[in-house]
Amino acid sequence: MRRYLSKILLWSWIVTLPISIIGGYLLYQMIDRTYTYNVRYGGAKEELQLDNIARYEIAQLVNYTRAHITKFLKNQETTLRPIHLIVPEANLATLQAHMPQSGFSYVKGRMLHQGKLKKVKVKYRGDTFYRWAWDKKSIRIKTAKQSLYEGIRSVNLLAPRTEEQLNNYLSYRLAKIMGVLAPRTELVRLYLNGEDQGVHTLVEQIKEITLRNASLMPGDIYRGEIIGKDRFGPGAPTDSLFRSAAVWDKVAVNNHFAESSNAPLQLLISLVQQSHLSEAQKQLSQIMDMKAWGAFSAFESLTQSAHTDEIHNWRIYFDPWRNQFVPIVWDSMGWHGNMRGAKLKNEVIANSLMRTLFQNGDFIRARSEALRSFFATGKDQAFLGIVSKAIDAMEHEVDTDPYLKPAKPDFVKSKIRRLEEVIQGVLAGIDGGFLENHSKPDSVIASARFDQQSLDLVIRGKHPVNTLRLNLSETVKTLPQAQVFYQSPTGEERVSLPVAASNTGASLVIQGGFLPNLTVEVGERFRGTLQSTPGVYRIAIEGLDPNTKI
């Protein structure tokens, strides 16, 4: 017995030494990460508490080992475009020296592109801990001016920040389909000094070159951010981007004016603050590209994104040729709330600017047309095809992603599939849909009472009635005029509308864009809810033969 015990004690180090090494490594990682991001950085987030970091480190080590074994046994290669970065270890140490502050300064590196190693600068990217507190970090690459990466100089390689992984990637793809200005995006596999870093989302950093690639005139791109370190910039502290132009800066500059020039933005903010005035709304119709803003709002509804809010994620281009503002999609995090139980909203009103626009008839018409066109032209089905393809690709990739977060491939796959179901549900129009013709079949959108050569028209719902067709008792040879009367906050308004004949003069067609009475109920944190009451119009047809009736 003593002999056996001696042998066990003699060889016990074979078991205890690896356990001690692994235990020591995990303990060091836990203490270091907790001290860096919870104690020194002061994140005060539940995820950065010691017990949660301990669970993360253990799960990450298990997943790292499993991913490499899976890749070796199955000989599984990535189906995504590989991005190879080479950064000297000394430069990586500089980035890591005093996180997170040290990570925000560029270090030199190289990038393999088209078979050549090209000089680049590399840093970590993001204002909040989920971008760089974990092993899979978000990175920004900046190329030389003479050596762009496929027409882009600043490239973000973003670590997915949610269990479902694909929120921003699919949001940007949807924006492109809808014709909304957005950065280029792609799913890629990142390799750093030859080591696999897993799946990242490539997102173009919005700069002047974004405009050039979209065939737009170079001009100012205003950036609205008062979150993270941007809370301490000029004009701060404040809880709204729409109180002062001082809290905005530019990521692209019209070189015909000083960089500090922001007169168009000042005008926009003043109009937002006076949005209850009809004159302010008229000016907004002039300085806002309403087709683009209507499409942007439709995009927010289809992604259920309230991430462009009162304090961050604003990118607005001012077109110097047309003197109009155009929205740019940025970090929208589509379907994030729906994945966590939020109910579908037909309208997303998450800030003062959108609250202002929802009081503008031209905007309402443009938004409705964007939604109608999206479904009528089959873009919804085209997008669902993109969703399915992206999810198939991710299911192939996560098994070998060494830094997958959360570090549970089967769990991530289930969440990705759930995201597909959520997107399908939103596009199918849960709870009534986006357009009235997707709603209850017995709902009455418009009704009219006729009186000889005039009518009283009532419009319900939240979308315009664009066309009226009036059948006549007699054919007309000379086109009459339509005079429309309605009540506004300042009193009765009168508008003349053009009239066209159809059916060889037996019918009249009026293109009016008649709206219900829409108001925005202001809620918490500058958000709003669209309320609808019937819109009432009196339409008089002038110039008809006295014997002709509607």
List PLM regions with ranges:
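Middle-to-C-terminal accessory/interaction subdomains
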Residues: 259-266, 270-309, 316, 323-463
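Conserved oxyanion/phosphate-binding beta-strand-loop segments in alpha/beta enzyme cores
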Residues: 103-161
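Short, solvent-exposed loop/turn and secondary-structure capping segments
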Residues: 96-98, 123, 152, 200, ...
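Regulatory N- and C-terminal appendages and interdomain linkers associated
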Residues: 2-116, 381-550
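Surface-exposed patches in mature extracellular/periplasmic domains of secreted proteins
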Residues: 154, 180-191, 280-284, 314, ...
